[in-house]
Amino acid sequence: MIWTAVIKGSALMTFVQGAMALVDKVFGEEILPHRIYSSGEAAQLLGMERLQVLEMVRAGTIKAKKVGDNYRILGSNLVEYMNR
């Protein structure tokens, strides 16, 4: 009986993970203002190379915070850049 519940729970989790992956794929191009993006993710969303994003961050064109050796960019900063 317990194994039946475990198997059903596992199947449900697999379904939920698949649904979440599908939602990410369908809506993945939308920039979420409160999400934090890496420079690579930002480059993909903006349709440019990562190095271009890093140059823009260093020039102050796109606002970002340096965390360790990497930059993190708030989605609202990407939206702000795109609306210029």
From Swiss-Prot:
Induction (UniProt): Part of the probable 17 gene mamAB operon.
Native organism: Magnetospirillum gryphiswaldense (strain DSM 6361 / JCM 21280 / NBRC 15271 / MSR-1)
Keyword Zinc: no
Additional remark text: This bacteria makes up to 60 cubo-octahedral magnetosomes of about 45 nm in diameter which contain membrane-bound crystals of magnetite (Fe(3)O(4)). Expression of just the minimal mamAB gene cluster (MGMSRv2__2365 to MGMSRv2__2381), including this gene, is sufficient to form a minimal magnetosome chain with small magnetite particles.
Keywords: Biomineralization, Magnetosome
Keyword Cell inner membrane: no
Pfam families named in the record: HTH_17
Phenotype upon gene inactivation: Normal magnetic response, slightly smaller, sometime scattered magnetosomes. Deletion of approximately 80 kb of DNA, including this operon, leads to cells that are non-magnetic, lack internal membrane systems, grow poorly, have reduced mobility and take-up and accumulate iron poorly.
Subcellular location: Magnetosome
Recorded GO MF terms: DNA binding
Cellular component per GO, a single term: magnetosome
InterPro entries: HTH_17 (IPR041657), SinI_DNA-bd (IPR010093)
Protein family membership: Belongs to the magnetosome MamR family.
Gene: mamR
Protein name per UniProt: Magnetosome protein MamR
Function summary: May play a role in controlling magnetite number and size. Coexpression of mamLQRBIEMO in a deletion of the 17 gene mamAB operon restores magnetosome vesicle formation but not magnetite biosynthesis.
